[in-house]
């Protein structure tokens, strides 16, 4: 019996097939297998953020524990089978939440890259890049940034520990995150 209660077959009155075709069943099974692989690759903290039913968590944990290739493949197939027994809305909710967290991770990486680009530009170009930064981020503390730039250059020249270099990154990261929370994405050119 299928989830909708109909057996695969043909409606005698209309001639239409009941239930999904075998090809559709295979595609669905493959999609669920891919989803199970993604779930098995997540950390426990990431799994906790997803709307996963309690009865699937032991299977996911068991899959993560197995290291043997063939045994892991078999366990992934079993996990996918257990997931196919779940309601379609449950699987869709897991997919949506997983995609949303992936998008959030991409945004965080983009913010880190933007911060690194600004730090590099400030150290290479000096005052011209600082002026542009202050135009894009008017809330920035000009004196603090100048001091951190000076100290970073001094540290590099003397081969000292990059304390000001790291602090400059933290200050820039704070500026960019504050700006991003206001939904005004600016990137250096």
Swiss-Prot record:
It holds the Pfam family DarP. InterPro entries: DarP (IPR006839), DarP_sf (IPR023153). It comes from the Bacteria. Gene3D superfamilies: PSPTO4464-like domains. The keyword Cell wall biogenesis/degradation does not apply. Keywords: Cytoplasm, Ribosome biogenesis, RNA-binding, rRNA-binding. One of its GO terms (cellular component) is cytosol. It is found in: Cytoplasm. Residues 1-22 are annotated as: Disordered. GO terms for biological process: assembly of large subunit precursor of preribosome. One of its GO terms (molecular function) is ribosome binding. The keyword rRNA-binding applies. Belongs to the DarP family. Member of a network of 50S ribosomal subunit biogenesis factors which assembles along the 30S-50S interface, preventing incorrect 23S rRNA structures from forming. Promotes peptidyl transferase center (PTC) maturation. PANTHER family: UPF0307 PROTEIN YJGA. This is Dual-action ribosomal maturation protein DarP. It comes from Xylella fastidiosa (strain Temecula1 / ATCC 700964).
């Amino acid at each position: 019996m299928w989830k909708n209660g109909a057996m695969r077959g043909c409606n005698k009155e209309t001639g239409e097939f009941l239930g999904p075709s075998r090809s559709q069943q295979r595609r669905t099974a493959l999609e669920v297998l891919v989803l199970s692989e993604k779930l098995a690759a997540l950390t426990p903290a990431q799994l906790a953020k997803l709307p996963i039913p309690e009865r699937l968590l032991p299977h996911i944990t068991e899959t993560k524990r197995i290291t043997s290739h063939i045994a892991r493949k078999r366990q992934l197939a079993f996990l996918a089978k257990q997931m196919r027994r779940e309601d379609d809305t449950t699987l869709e909710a897991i997919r949506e939440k997983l995609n949303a967290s992936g998008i959030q991770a991409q945004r965080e990486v983009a913010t880190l890259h933007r911060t690194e680009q600004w730090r590099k530009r400030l150290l290479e170009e000096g005052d011209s890049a600082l002026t542009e930064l202050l135009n894009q981020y008017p809330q920035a503390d000009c004196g603090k940034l100048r001091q951190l730039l000076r100290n970073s250059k001094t540290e590099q020249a003397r081969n000292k520990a990059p304390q000001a270099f790291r602090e400059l990154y933290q200050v820039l990261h704070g500026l960019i995150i504050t700006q991003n929370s206001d939904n005004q994405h600016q990137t250096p050119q």
